[in-house]
Amino acid sequence: MTNLTLALDAMGGDFGPRITVPATLQALRLNPLLKVILVGDQVQIDEYLVPAEPEIKRRIEIKHTTEVVTMSDRPVHALRNRKQSSMRIAIELVRDGKAQACLSAGNTGALMAMSKVLLKTLPGIDRPALVSCLPAVNNTPVYLLDLGANVSCDSETLFQFAVMGSVLSETVDKTVSPKVALLNVGIEEIKGNDQVQQAGQLLQQIPQVNYTGFIEGDEIYSGNVDVIVCDGFVGNITLKTSEGIARLLTHQLKKGLTEGFFVRILAKIIAPRIHSLLNQMNPDHYNGASLIGLRGIVVKSHGCADEAAFLQAICLAVTEAQRRLPQMIEDRLESILLDINS
């Protein structure tokens, strides 16, 4: 394992340095080979670096800027007018080879726009995709993409997403021949719109992707597949609905376990199991969405992430950098194109 550097937008998200800096300190304690460049207002950042050990501080660099991309900034406005923002500088550090990955909890649209313009897409990739991990009943991760970077997609784009998702599962989780499916309104080949049907036909012709066919919404968490592909409109609604249901179940479970004397006693007895169950359903446990298909690594954290959730996103960015995810995707695409043309 070699040293790596993470560029971190310290000002992004709902809480800025109050969350990003303490989470960074935790990550540095966990990984002695990690260095972090914190981009943002040095005065605010320094306030949260006070408890850091000298050895930890030596692995932190600060790029000072007071400009921030706000949550209300439109992507085009951010591109044109936020050229000294903490988000943009963090991405530029990846572009210039000074960092191997970038992480931000800021404005998603601005992050995607800046990343695509500054880092460019990989050869053979038309559009980057936003992908995140979901829980499954067998405790294996399931990747869902796209989550909103591309509201509408043609069949070729869905095909590219399937290839990238397959490589992601192999690279990050070491899954052997990940099972890939297209999210659809039915499993029959005649179901779905033209784009989904045509994407399925393309994938059937590519042996390098273990395409299993269509999958319906009620099978997303079954663990029967490793990668689920859809356009960003469907994916974003699916993700947000999942997070809402998880919070509802958590609320109802906590409420139910406080009603009645004997129930409260039982709850204390099985508290460790309840805690484990709630943790599995907690969306923060899966924090960190990757913008894949770019020539560099960009990870988006939830804006409302707490310290533990932001640490999860840091760990994801580090893992993708260590395993050279963009290069792995590029190599796989090159192999597929060679087979198609041979």
From Swiss-Prot:
<dbReference type="GO" id="GO:0006633">
    <property type="term" value="P:fatty acid biosynthetic process"/>
</dbReference>
<keyword id="KW-0808">Transferase</keyword>
<comment type="function">
    <text>Catalyzes the reversible formation of acyl-phosphate (acyl-PO(4)) from acyl-[acyl-carrier-protein] (acyl-ACP). This enzyme utilizes acyl-ACP as fatty acyl donor, but not acyl-CoA.</text>
</comment>
<keyword id="KW-0443">Lipid metabolism</keyword>
<comment type="subunit">
    <text>Homodimer. Probably interacts with PlsY.</text>
</comment>
<keyword id="KW-0963">Cytoplasm</keyword>
<dbReference type="GO" id="GO:0008654">
    <property type="term" value="P:phospholipid biosynthetic process"/>
</dbReference>
<comment type="pathway">
    <text>Lipid metabolism; phospholipid metabolism.</text>
</comment>
<comment type="similarity">
    <text>Belongs to the PlsX family.</text>
</comment>
<dbReference type="Pfam" id="PF02504">
    <property type="entry name" value="FA_synthesis"/>
</dbReference>
<keyword id="KW-0444">Lipid biosynthesis</keyword>
<dbReference type="GO" id="GO:0005737">
    <property type="term" value="C:cytoplasm"/>
</dbReference>
<keyword id="KW-0594">Phospholipid biosynthesis</keyword>
<keyword id="KW-1208">Phospholipid metabolism</keyword>
<dbReference type="InterPro" id="IPR003664">
    <property type="entry name" value="FA_synthesis"/>
</dbReference>
<dbReference type="InterPro" id="IPR012281">
    <property type="entry name" value="Phospholipid_synth_PlsX-like"/>
</dbReference>
<dbReference type="GO" id="GO:0043811">
    <property type="term" value="F:phosphate:acyl-[acyl carrier protein] acyltransferase activity"/>
</dbReference>
<protein>
    <recommendedName>
        <fullName>Phosphate acyltransferase</fullName>
        <ecNumber>2.3.1.274</ecNumber>
    </recommendedName>
</protein>
